[in-house]
């Protein structure tokens, strides 16, 4: 109703879960910014909001038309048939925006900021900085035409881009150069030739629809791809030695057969809803799939060429709940409301239990006897420590971009260095 009339505010997925999409208007965000500004004036220790009090109630139009200022601010899970009494107390994801309506930050279900963006004040919508949680910010510079001319990496390789007619030159901070030659336009521009930093050259060919039809490597070896004119499906591949592999499809564009250069054929068959019911290998061995009912998307059993049958039970969310092998040995699986595996139960009482933190990272694996292995992470999500059941601790240190630079175990430290 009102400003949100005609907007989608709820979604129900195929498993019956219901999600609420929280939409906000520019005026609502402006009012919230003014409240924060007022609060910051009365509390000097409180950081002043980015937009201060200059948060406009409306947004100017764009080249695509008026901007009503409506943005997605949060997604909530409001109904879960499998966990009706255990709904999350916080949104699954949350978004904040600048005073110009640009995406400012993304927060996960633990309310941890996982991505952040910076924009050019003189060019609304032009991103000049991007950062993942625990990582340095990547910066971007543009030319007058709005093209990226420099990508600045404070902890690694940076890149400079030079644009010419049908040619882009990419130079990294070690002065290594790659040249991309392009053809086409109006959305069909494609890279047809690459000059790599080591002096080698590769070529690519495309059809009138911009689909890849040939590739020539640095040694001059050419691979060709035949395409169905209508669907774009690959119908044949011819390798540099002239050997051809053919592909066949049904009316639903599902692969039904592959004929290799030696003449041997592998086949796939589907039922009317399009589910895979059998696969026959090049050697003639067939695996068959059976489904519980006409609506099941995942197979209940598979039977191989020897007649051995395996059984699977699935949750309404497509998670494997039980697997029984051909000897009758069964393994069962349990999951939490976020779809993460929490337990594995095997025969003879052999079980493993898993726990996760509020960001969904694995923090503990415990067996039925209570032996526990614990895991620790840094802000970027890198695994920094593993503590085994006997108390031994191994640690890993990382650089700014997540590459391991040292490992320590049993008092012994190993260091790693990298080139660029």
Give the role of each language-model region.
Residues 1-420:
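Extended charged/polar low-complexity repeat regions
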């Amino acid at each position: 109703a009102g400003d949100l009339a005609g907007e989608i505010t709820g979604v129900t997925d195929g498993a019956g879960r219901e999600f609420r999409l929280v939409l906000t208007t520019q005026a609502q965000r402006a009012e919230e910014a003014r409240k924060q500004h007022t609060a910051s004036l009365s509390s000097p220790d409180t950081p002043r909001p980015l937009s201060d009090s200059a948060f406009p109630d409306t947004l100017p139009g764009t080249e695509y038309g008026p901007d009503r200022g409506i943005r997605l601010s949060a997604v909530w899970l409001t109904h879960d048939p499998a966990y009706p009494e255990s709904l999350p107390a916080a949104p699954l994801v949350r978004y904040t925006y600048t005073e110009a309506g640009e995406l400012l930050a993304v927060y996960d279900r633990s309310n941890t900021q996982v991505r952040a963006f910076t924009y050019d004040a003189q060019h609304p919508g032009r991103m000049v900085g991007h950062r993942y949680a625990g990582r340095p910010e990547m910066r971007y510079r543009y030319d007058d035409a709005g093209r990226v001319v420099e990508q600045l990496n404070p902890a690694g390789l940076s890149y400079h881009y030079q644009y010419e007619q049908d040619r882009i030159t990419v130079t990294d901070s070690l002065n290594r150069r790659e040249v991309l030659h392009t053809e086409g336009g109006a959305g069909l521009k494609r890279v047809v030739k690459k000059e790599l930093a080591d002096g080698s050259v590769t070529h690519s060919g495309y059809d009138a629809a911009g689909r890849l039809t040939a590739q020539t490597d640095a040694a001059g070896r050419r691979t060709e791809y035949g395409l169905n004119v209508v669907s774009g499906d690959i119908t044949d591949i011819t390798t540099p030695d002239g050997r051809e592999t053919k592909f066949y499809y049904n009316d639903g564009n599902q692969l039904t057969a592959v004929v290799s250069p030696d003449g041997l054929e592998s086949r796939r068959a589907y039922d009317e809803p399009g589910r895979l019911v059998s696969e026959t290998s090049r050697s003639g061995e067939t695996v068959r799939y059976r489904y519980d009912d006409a609506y099941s998307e995942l197979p209940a059993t598979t039977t191989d060429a020897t007649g051995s049958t395996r059984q699977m039970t699935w949750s309404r969310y497509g998670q494997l709940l039980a697997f029984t092998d051909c000897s009758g040995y069964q393994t069962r699986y349990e999951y939490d409301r976020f779809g993460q595996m929490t337990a594995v139960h095997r025969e003879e009482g052999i079980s493993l239990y898993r726990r996760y933190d509020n960001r969904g990272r694995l923090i503990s694996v415990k067996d039925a006897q209570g032996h526990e292995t614990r895991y620790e992470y840094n802000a970027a999500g890198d695994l920094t420590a593993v503590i085994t059941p006997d108390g031994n601790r191994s640690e890993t240190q990382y650089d700014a971009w997540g590459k391991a630079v040292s490992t320590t175990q049993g008092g012994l430290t190993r260091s790693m260095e990298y080139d660029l």
